[in-house]
Amino acid sequence: MLLNQVMNKITKIIEFPFVVLKMQIKQNECQSLKDNIKLAQLRISAPKCFDRDFEYPWVLRNIDIKKGKLLDIGSTVGQMLHDVLPKDIEINTLNINNQKDVEGVKQIEGDIRKTDFKSNLFDCITCISTLEHIGVEGRYGVKKDEFGDTKAMKEMFRILKPGGKLYLTVPYGAKDVLPINKLYNKKRTEKLFKGYKLVKEEYLKYDKRYGIWLTVPEKEAAKTVWQKDKWYSLGLFVLQK
């Protein structure tokens, strides 16, 4: 086991400059070399079992409508939602970039901070690890907007039907790692959730000693330091209008 650990570390050291070079050439996330180095350092130490492996099943388990309109924000999972959820649910996706066509999914290019949707339109909204990027300059070509996430939450509230639910996941922890991710804590979420009813909250934290994710109390998740703990924690919320 010790030999495997040493070999893994050596492999990561060898791979690192090539990972950075690929990111710098593509520039599909960060634009500056400094930021791409930071992102590569974080990615190399990322858990084998990634946060999306928990977020997607969590969202699918908790969605409780059988029919109606669903909107997925920052979507990369329109196909999965269409394939897994009841067929009487109309799947809509919203993304600031062009999306690959998905049969049976209505795709809209736009910004969740300000949309053309009518008020009280959607029965539920999913926003999976997207809120933390809104208005954070330096990644995905986003322009700085200090209150971008607040604007997004207000717009989602506007377009949700009364009684409709928002299924939201965000990185959780003690300190932002900009421009990679904004991290949330109780103080931030309480401001963002103003007007919503908090129906459910869960927190997951990566245990670097054993390489597993654990369900933890909010206070434990809030103490997470990304670089020290090898990854951020996750906050998973069900909110109702």
Q: At which residue positions do the language-model features occur?
A:
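Class I SAM-dependent methyltransferase Rossmann-like catalytic core
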Residues: 8-64
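Class I SAM-dependent methyltransferase SAM/SAH-binding core
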Residues: 69-114
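A short acidic, Gly/Pro-enriched loop at the edge of an enzyme's catalytic core
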Residues: 113-126
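A short glycine-rich, Lys/Arg-flanked "PGG" loop and its adjoining helix->strand segment in the class I
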Residues: 143-162
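Conserved beta-strand signature within the Rossmann-like core of class I S-adenosyl-L-methionine
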Residues: 163-171
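Core SAM-dependent methyltransferase catalytic element
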Residues: 214-241
